[in-house]
Amino acid sequence: SYLFIYKTNLLYADQQSYKLTLLSSTVITFQYITQILVLILFHNYTLYLIVLLVSTFFNNFFASKIADKNYPYLRQMEVSELTTYEKKNIIEDVKSMFIYKSGSVIMNYTDNILISIFVGTIFVGYYSNYLLIITMINTFISIIIRGITGSIGNLIAEEDKARTKDVFYIFTYFFQFIGIICTSCLLFLFNDFINIWIGSEYLLDNATVIIIIVSFYITCINNQNWIFREAGGLYKNVRLVMIIAAIINLILSIIFGYLYGLSGVLVSTLIARLLTLCWYDPLVLSKNLFVEKFKYYLLKQFKYFFILLIVIFMDWLIPYNNVTTFVDFIIKGFFIFINSTFWFLLLNIKNKDQKNMFMKIKYLLNQVLKK
């Protein structure tokens, strides 16, 4: 797929990645539907992976065609030799990225192996049911991330640190909005959905479900850190921290997995992330991109966390009937979503980042209407 996909980097750098959004959404939707049908009809994991492979190929192939259409000069360009300085920088950046990504793989993809060892393969399946929902949410969030990373890179290149800081906190607000609303909805709807979908025998205990949801929340509210770090090319600054996080995760997962099973493995990943990346990433950004006191960022995040607790409490106060059908689930989900959104917006009514966010949305809508 790399023979095709490299061209699409131009679309991201040129802030034209929205042209890939419809393609990505269509392919992902088709992929999920086909994978579900394959598992139901054939119970064959190999076919499941083949669907993933084919979907990835077609997504990258057509994305490449979109890039060719937008930048026809790609077919006519003469290839020139890179300077020694350029090669040195590229090699150094690739080394840093390789170290970081290697740590990321250990950090994010060892849980299932350890769960299988300490608890059993059947619990990997139980956990995967919940993880599938989280993955679907994160997939659509990633589409948003891909669409804005290029514009953030351009912003950083302009070296306007005050503007960079303001935009960073707008995105902090945005991902807190997504994180808080989704967290509250998951807290009150997760087990209901699993129960209706595949049955009560596949439900995990409440403590484990809460750990899964908290992990999702922590990941979501750190998206702006990862976006600005990647756009700013700061892999050198954080590469060793990811390795440290991976080592902490592996050690804790072995200890807690042996003692507490599934919940022990999952909470180990959460602890490792909190002890390293969650505070070090924004610290690096505050020192390198917008020269902001780190405590200001922490104060904002604690305020948002307090808002999360209030939103959850207000959702808990609403009486709900037992959810036995998808209609009941949709009705309950609707009220939780509306109530969560209302309280989040109300509690942020004096937040300048919320005001800036609405101004940005209003500007974009006006631009669309003018066209």
Residue ranges and their predicted role:
Residues 1-24, 46, 213-245, 259:
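Membrane-interface junctions at transmembrane-helix termini in multi-pass inner-membrane proteins
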Residues 27, 51-63, 67, 83-154, ...:
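Transmembrane helical elements of multi-pass membrane transporters/channels
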Residues 187-217, 263:
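Interfacial segments at transmembrane-helix termini and the short loops linking adjacent helices
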Residues 91-94, 128, 160-177, 181-189, ...:
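Interfacial transmembrane-helix starts/ends
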Residues 293, 315-371:
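Membrane-proximal transmembrane or re-entrant/amphipathic helices at the cytosolic face
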Residues 12-13, 72, 134-172, 226-231:
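Helix-loop junctions and terminal segments of transmembrane helices
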Residues 45-49, 61-108, 151-166, 284-302, ...:
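Interhelical loop/hinge segments that connect adjacent transmembrane helices in multipass membrane
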Residues 21-71, 131, 244-248, 262-283, ...:
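Hydrophobic alpha-helical transmembrane segments
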